[in-house]
């Protein structure tokens, strides 16, 4: 039985106050079912940041992984862009 490919998302870090954990906001564009307008939906994921390298505003790529805690199922794969703060 082959293993399914893991999901990858891109988003912005909105919180880095926890040790080795960041909160990443991921935006997706969804078409409204009745009116047809494209609407932005935002979802927040807790992601594991082993080296505490991410800061608020960084653009990061997160990858799905095994459950690391009650809320963490994602890890930071790479930092795509540093924030200018």
UniProtKB/Swiss-Prot annotation:
This is Small ribosomal subunit protein uS17. One of the primary rRNA binding proteins, it binds specifically to the 5'-end of 16S ribosomal RNA. It holds the Pfam family Ribosomal_S17. Belongs to the universal ribosomal protein uS17 family. The keyword Transferase does not apply. GO terms for cellular component: cytosolic small ribosomal subunit. Part of the 30S ribosomal subunit.
